[in-house]
């Protein structure tokens, strides 16, 4: 997800899981408009794109969040000319394999679904996808279309988070959209969100 409340969904999920005692890493994989570094107060001069472009030590990527020892952050790094190529690289696959071996939860803050190439690439690398929708922004038909397209390429869709609903609002037909990707450990098959057609509530994974 990118920016605003979509971005906050990934961040809040990572923080909640880390507060529960799990080892968590969150990655900014929006290589076109990165924002995660700003939220956590990190420099973005070095990050994921440096690693994917040839710097092979993943330990240099991990930025500890001082206020929450269980949480590690990987910022995007400098914006590259070839985001899709980097995300589909063997280096990206190897990095996720390394992280899944060493962390209970790996949460990827992804580009908006409108950038479908990046979203599709990431969806094939992770255990599951969560759609984060914004009330009042785009049609539910469009959300369902993206959901179907991800399903067609074999992505496991955990469910949908709907943000931005006002208690006084009666207009539920239009939503914004973006995707978050979650990669829990292989030995933990419990999804963060139950599979639903529209909206679900978040469940803490076991462990």
Segments from the language model and where they lie:
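P-loop NTP-binding module
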Residues: 1-207
